[in-house]
Amino acid sequence: DYGMRAVKSVLDAAGNLRRKHPDMNEASTVLTAVNQINRPKFLIDDLALYSGIIGDLFLNVEEPVQDNSLLVRAIEEVGLAQNVHNHPAFLNKILELREMILVRHGLMIVGDPLSGKTCCYTMLQEALSLLNARKELPCDLNPKHELKTDVFVINPKSISMGDLYGYNDLVSQEWSDGVLSKIYRAASACASHSDNRKWIVFDGPVDAVWIENMNTVLDDNRKLCLVSGEMLPMSQYMNMVFETLNLDQASPATVSRCGMVYMSAPDCTTSAARGNTENPGNNALLNEAAWVPHVRAWLNTMPAVVSRNPVLVETIVLLYKWAIPPLVNLMTDELKSCQMLPASGIAMVHAVNRMFGCVLQTHWASAAAEEE
């Protein structure tokens, strides 16, 4: 999508950059804005082509480095508290999500299961709330951007359209708010006495059955139109976030109205794995950066006899590095036809964690009994 909505988003991003960095030259401002809007929605293999096109359009123009040190430190603190390893690729996705939220009131986070979609926006929420709590510190905070954030999560496919948007009772003809209309009404009303950001997250498949009624919310009207004839306005601190696996059933009209952040699990895979066109799922975990953080986070939850023993932790990680790649290749190649349900490589790693944890706990219990 490179229509007028995309152009307007680039102009909004450029305006924000101009106000934040008035000394930045115009070419660098436009280049940074274009990258902020377009880079998050590309696959890892498409970024090289995109970078080449941008390099031809902006000759001898360098993109200035953005100072996000305050937000990065807050994200690292949140990651430490939530037992999340802040891999550079994942940290970059969080920053991309934050930039997208500032220029688009509707956005989609697309990715496979366990690719970090939920963790991405929850960590950003906690980091922004943490920065907001530190307003008394001598920090260069933008009160419009670093605000305490409230999140409301809805599964749109778990309820009917009437329960989602609201309905008129057939007998009494009285209007009853649905889940979305009730949350939307409360979030819009809070704007008059609260500056907290409100994110309404739709965690589920995106299809034309329920999302077409959101078109007036996602475009410049920013109003939720109910079947009762009521129109609920959206405040400037509200965002509609769609967390979904893919956009196969979404219409182009809906996609063009939203910003896009693609959480690609193969972001950390090797070029050799990405070049395997016969079986895209094969070798998806050859690069350790894609799955070792999951193992280290799991080891942090183990008893102190393991988590506080760095030698034992590194030994277990080395065993995983030796065993996981061939096991994943075996499951995705030779045993693929035996799987009742397809599983991603990260899901297989989590399954190994659970089974290995059971073995270790049995061993520790017997060892403790012998010591007693």
Model-derived regions, located:
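Conserved catalytic/switch belt of AAA+ P-loop NTPases
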Residues: 129, 169-193, 197-243, 265-266
